[in-house]
Amino acid sequence: MNHTKQKSWPQRLLALLAAVVLCAALPAAALAEENTASIQTQVSETDEDIPWADPPQSTPETGRPDPAVPTPPPQDPATPETAQTGEHLEGYSLSLGETVTIYFYVTLPEDTPQDAAMQFTLPDSTVTQVAVADAKQMEANGKSCTAFPCQVAAKQLTDDIEARMVVNGKYGPVYTYTVKDYLNYLLEHDYPQQAKELAGTLLVYGGKAQLYFGYRTDALAGTAEPNSTANWGSYQFESSGTQTDDYYGSSLLLEPVIQIRHYFMVPDGAECTFTFAWNAGEPETELQPVDTNTRFNGKKVYYVVTPAIAFRRADAMPVVAMRQNGADLCILRYGVFSYGDMVRALAAVDESQLPLLNLLRALDDLTTAAQRYSVAG
């Protein structure tokens, strides 16, 4: 099933492949730019909090040091001297919403300033800081803790996250942990079955993301095959309105958040508005069109990008509307698995599509597990 108009090969590349090269979350001039993931620290209110994990007392199978007894990093001229900043690592938790977010829980001395921060460093040299003032204040193990969030892409579940406090210009000791460590902890200990199912499906999704993006494929988060049969026929997209032919195509963004990019043709001089709603009749959010500097059939091609889609809502069929002076030109009902249904059909005749198909199958399983976990409370 083709989700684009019949057009020349370069134009098909724009609509079909532009973002299936699955950008770094953001917006085809920019494929190279889109493949550099940006890590942010904003957490959605729709996140599902996954249970607490204590710092492991020993991890001989990974050879990792006990995070409660951090090991100072080797010093070189570019590395600041390690100081005693007074914090104590208490444990971890994970939130799964629009992103994968792991929290480092620490107790801090009472005189820790609000501009002190936890600094996170990933293997790709991404460095972020979260100030005490911006972190969550939580109770854990009967103690008042500060929970610092660190977001990672699905392909980064096996990446070492190095965390250290920065207080008054001084750098504390380094704590090293991975999201995979956390998920394995859940699977190996006494946690509800729904939490274990969610942990297992997230590991499989992370492994399929690594294979699709060609990222650290020698150390996969999960190696099992997804259970989903990719039966997505009910997700075929629907369009209505007076000018449905002005719908040009769609592409899918999977990193670092899930979004759908829709392309529309707009006549010269026309002032069109675009909106997004999770369902018809629900409150709408205005979308800002972006000029692709491409023309087709004498019209300009623009795209709009949906808001980030949480993992547990990946089976939704949101509505994007193109209007002019209040008239419905094109009302498009299209979800993640609308795109998945097209990939399934392509994979039947083109094996190169199988990594993407398997990634979407794993997402299907993860969505189901996240919904079950949410219902279980």
Sequence positions of predicted segments:
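Short, surface-exposed linear motifs at loops/turns and structural transition points
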Residues: 76, 80-377
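Ser/Thr/Gly/Pro-rich low-complexity, disordered linker/stalk segments of secreted
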Residues: 35-82
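Bacterial N-terminal signal peptides
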Residues: 15-25
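Intrinsically disordered, low-complexity proline-rich segments enriched in Ser/Thr
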Residues: 22, 57-58, 164
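Sec-dependent signal peptide cleavage junction
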Residues: 24-40
